[in-house]
Every structure is written in structure tokens, then in C-alpha cells.
Amino acid sequence: MKTPVELAISGMQTLHVQHRGRSGYRVKVRPSYVDETLFGSPAGTRPVPPDFDPPWMKKANRSRGVGTGVSQALGANGSCESTSSSGSTPTLTPRKKNKYRLISHTPSYCDESLFGSRQEGAGWEAKWMARGDAAKLHALFWTPPATPRGSHSPRPRETPVRCVHPADLSKTEHRVMASSRRLSVDGLDTPRPLRRERSHSLTHPNVPSTGHTPASSPCTSGPRDPRPAPSGVTFRSPLVTPRAGSVSVSVPTTPRQGGATQKTKPPWK
């Protein structure tokens, strides 16, 4: 009967034999890039990964780099099946030869901002374009004109902008004062004329908002006195402004059509 020590020694020997067999089997497997990066190279020699050149590299540099990469890969892996020359791509490299790949790459604005300025000899014309058409090419830096041109413009460029003449404002004031005076003569006691006066606030800036009706204002048939009342009351009729007094002098031109002439006293006398 074996002692526990002998049993332990024999178990260790069997485990060692199994480990030898498994390790010898794993050496024959071709190492992948995942196993090398995670667990290291089993044989101690790691093949050089393929280098990817940018498309604007010259053809001589790319062929030289491919040749050195192929020689190193063949030296590291003796069991490689590809026995082709150094110019051809090996089976280990994932890059394949593509006939549509750009060899002479013309740098764009993105390439200039990322990888430097543009080359001196690079042109913007295509190979199938004529020389006359290539001379017409220019960069697309276009901004719209500041003013519209042609018939779509609302105003020609030669005609200046017309400004509002002060005489037009005086005519509108005459018209507004005549209409408001006609309403006050008709005897409308509703606060509607006040609302009308408020709507013409641009022509009457000094009109205060009061609750009195125009019937409480002084006599509308005679000439108005632009001077304030002797009492200290700050109330002012909507029509007794300095501007309204000056306008009311020139307004009574309509009674002349009836034949009776009315002479008004100027406000400065």
C-alpha cells in the first residue's frame, strides 16, 4: 500500500506529463494578435504587425516598407505557407491589393488642417478636363451681394430715400383738428371724442387723459384763448393746447363758402 506522500508524488508526475503534452500541442498553433497582446508570445519571438501607410505617401516608401515587413514576417514564422517574393503581400497581413486605391492623393482643406499645408505642385483640375477649363477653376468662397440686383429690387439704387416733409405733418394736423372740432360742434357728449383724441397721440403730445367731456370745455363757437385760466387748476381741455390754438386760427375757412366772413383775433394780441 502506497503512502500518501508517494501518491502525491505520482499525481504530480502525471499532471506534469499531461501539461507537457498540452503545451507541445499549443506551440504548433499559429499565434494570433489577440493572444499576443493578452498573454504574450509563446515562443518569445513576436512577428511585426503590418503597417498601414496613409494614401498620400509616395509609392517608393510604401513598397520599401512592405518589403521589410514581409521579410520580418517570413523570418519569424518558418511554417508560413506563402513562398512568394518580397514584393507581393503575404497571407498574414490583412491588407489586400486594391486597384481602385488612390496612389497620387490630392490634399483637400481637411487634409491641410489636419496634416499640414498643401503641396506646391498639386492642382485642382481633373485629368479628363481641358486646359482652358482648368484655368477657370477657383475656390468656392462666395458671399451673396449686399443689395439685391435686377428687377427684384424694390427700389433702384439711383433713387434716394424720400423723407417725410414737415408740411405733410401740418396738413394731417389740420385734418385732425377739423374733424375733432366738427365732432365737438355737433354736441357729442359721449367720451368717444376723447378716445379719438387719444388715438392721435402723435399729433397731440400734450393731451392729458381726463374724464371730462368736451361739453365741459369753454364755448366752442367763439375763438379760444390759448392762455391758461387764472385759477391754479392744471386741467386743460384736449383742444386748448398751444398747437391747437395756432391751428384753430387757420381752421375756420369753411364758413366763407356761405358768404359770411369771420375775423378771429390772433393769439399774440
From Swiss-Prot:
Residues 128-156 are annotated as: Interaction with RBPJ/RBPSUH. A motif (Nuclear export signal) lies at residues 5-17. Residues 202-220, 247-269 have a biased composition (Polar residues). It is found in: Cytoplasm; Nucleus; Cytoplasm, Cytoskeleton, Microtubule organizing center, Centrosome. A motif (Nuclear localization signal) lies at residues 92-108. One of its GO terms (molecular function) is tubulin binding. GO terms for cellular component: centrosome; cytoplasm; nucleus. Residues 79-93 have a biased composition (Low complexity). Its main location: cytoplasm. Keywords: Cytoplasm, Cytoskeleton, Neurogenesis, Notch signaling pathway, Nucleus. Residues 67-94, 145-269 are annotated as: Disordered. It holds the Pfam family RITA. GO terms for biological process: negative regulation of Notch signaling pathway; neurogenesis; Notch signaling pathway; nuclear export. Residues 156-269 are annotated as: Interaction with tubulin. PANTHER family: RBPJ-INTERACTING AND TUBULIN-ASSOCIATED PROTEIN 1 (PTHR34917:SF1). Tubulin-binding protein that acts as a negative regulator of Notch signaling pathway. Shuttles between the cytoplasm and the nucleus and mediates the nuclear export of RBPJ/RBPSUH, thereby preventing the interaction between RBPJ/RBPSUH and NICD product of Notch proteins (Notch intracellular domain), leading to down-regulate Notch-mediated transcription. May play a role in neurogenesis. Belongs to the RITA family. Interacts with RBPJ/RBPSUH. This is RBPJ-interacting and tubulin-associated protein 1. The lineage of its organism: Eukaryota, Metazoa, Chordata, Craniata, Vertebrata.
